[in-house]
Amino acid sequence: MASSSGIGVMFRREQAPQQLPDYARRVEAAGFDELWVVEDCFYTGGIAQAATALAATQRVTVGLGIAPAVARNAAFLAMELATLARMHPGRVHGGIGHGVAEWMDQIGARPESWLGALEETTTAVRRLLRGERLTV
C-alpha cells in the first residue's frame, strides 16, 4: 500500500462512473498526489473505481474511502487490495470503515458492535496482506 502526505481530491459518488478515467487523468495533470474514490451502498463499487482510476493514470495514488467492514468479506477485500497493489505498486490506499448504519441495515449487515466488526475486519485484512494464514 502507498504512503503519502500529499494533497488529494475525491471523485464524488454522484458522478457517473464513465467520467472517472478522464477525471483521474485531469487530477494527475493538475499535480494532485491522491485521488479518492467512494464506496457507498447503492452508488458505485469502490474497487472497480480504484482499478479504473489506477489504469487511467501513471503517478497519482488512489485511495478507497471506504470499504464497509460489515459488507465486505475480509479475505476477498484483502485479495482485491493486494491485486491492485501488485498491479500498481505504491499507488494504493485501502480504506476500511464501519459504513453508514442505515445503509448497512438495508442490506442486513448490522453487527453487534460496529467498532468490534471494524477491528476484526481490519485486523484480518492486515494479516492477510502480510501473507499470514487465518483460521475462521
Question: Can you describe what each PLM-predicted range is?
Answer:
Residues M1-G65:
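N-terminal beta1-alpha1-beta2 module of alpha/beta enzyme domains
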Residues S3-S5, A78-V136:
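Internal, glycine-rich beta/alpha segment that forms the wall or movable "lid"
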Residues R13-Q15, C41, P68-V70, H98-V100, ...:
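Active-site-proximal loop/turn and secondary-structure-junction residues that shape catalytic pockets
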Residues P17, A67, G108-P111:
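Active-site oxyanion-binding pockets that recognize sulfate/phosphate
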Residues D22-A24, Q49-T52, F76-M79, I107-P111:
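Short, glycine/charged-enriched secondary-structure capping and boundary segments
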Residues F32, V70-N73, W103-D105, W114:
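Conserved N-terminal glycine/acidic-rich loop preference
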Residues L64-F76:
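Structural motif corresponding to the early beta-alpha repeats
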